[in-house]
Every structure is written in structure tokens, then in C-alpha cells.
Amino acid sequence: VRTVPAIAEGLEKLRSRVLIFCYQLSHIRSGKSHIQKSLSVWKPELERYTGLVQQIKEKSKERKALVAEKKELPIYHVKRHKALTVRIAELIEDLEELRSEKALLLQKFEYAEDAGAEEFRKDIATMEAGLKKLETQEQKYSTELDKALTEYAELKAQATEFDPVELYEARRAIRPVQEKESEKQLEDAMHEKPFLIMLLGAKQETSRLLGEDAEERQVRQLIAHKRQEQHRNSISKRKRSDPER
């Protein structure tokens, strides 16, 4: 049976579903943003790390070759000896700087001193897998949200035969309980209390998607119009009952 309380309850239940999906999507997008920011740091730093490792490898190889050459070089090749000594000293200095930079980079990401590029790749792969999982969830909840919005619009269309003010007031009366129930469902699903700021954002998004501001304005106008009518009727009645005035 289509009655004002039944329609009000149906609309508020659908509104609660919209609110839940808005919150979950906001939570997912926040997680995605966090991972994307991390990846934007990790990926270039992995390139930097592999670059440092490559430079250390090349300079170590060059130093080793020059040390061997110097060892084999006859003493009377004074000029070459000096050139080799200068170059070896430069390479030692370069290697110290590169190793120090590499150590600081590992420290920044809380890796062990002997960690290799594999550690970076492993963490990047974990983040990318997490991002993919969140993207799948985002798609799922976006579809669910669209479905709830369609159902809401269909039920709203059926409610046109009822007094909009009466329906609005019936909905407002049960909304606090429905919203509390939504928060409980979110807490059960996410194993944590909903974040207040995110929850407020989800409520604003729900209101926007359901066009609640326009609906509220319309109801206020109807109430104001009704009051004016009542006021006019009351004046007209008084005039009829007191013809001398």
C-alpha cells in the first residue's frame, strides 16, 4: 500500500544507501590519492637508486682498472703515474659521495643498508596492486550508487500524488535514525568508525545528488504560501462574522 509513511521510509532507506556509497567512494578515492602520491615519489627514487648503483659499479670498475694499471706501470712513467693518482683520488671521492647518497636514499625509505633495487620494486608492486584493487572497488560502488539513484528517482516519481510538505516532514522525522543506521553499517563494513570530515562530505554529496536544496526551497515556499492562504482566509472569515467593520 502506498502511503506517506511507506514512501517516506522507502526514500530514506534509498537515501541511506546513497550516503553509504558516497562515503565508501570518498574513502576509496582518498586511498587512491595517497597511493598515487607515494608512487610519484617511489618510482623516480627507484630510477635514481638504480642510477646511483650503476654509477658506483662503473666508477669502481674504472678505479680497479686504474689501480691495476698503476701497479704494473714502470716507475719512470712519472707523468702517467701522476695522472693515474689524480684520477684514482677523484674516483675515490666520487664513490664516497655516491655511496653516501645511496645510503641516505635507503634511510629515507627505511630500508636496510644492504637493500637492493628489488626492495623498491617489491614495494612499488604492492602499491600498484593496492591501487588496482581500489580502482575495482571504485567501479563497483559507482555502479551501486547509480543503481540506488535510479531507484530513488523512480520512487520519487511515484510520490507526486502525495502532499509534498507532509512527505518532507515524514522523511525529516525518520532521517536521524536512518543516518545513525548508515553510520553503523559503515563501521561494520570498514571495521572503524567513519571519519567525521569524510562523513560530512558524503552527506553534502548525497544532498547534491538528490537535489535536496531545491526540494527544501520548494517545501518552504509551499509552507509560506499555505500560511498566507490561511491568514487571508482568517481575515476574510473575521470580516464576514463582523460586517460592521
Regions found by a protein language model. Name each.
Residues 1-245:
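Extended intrinsically disordered terminal tails
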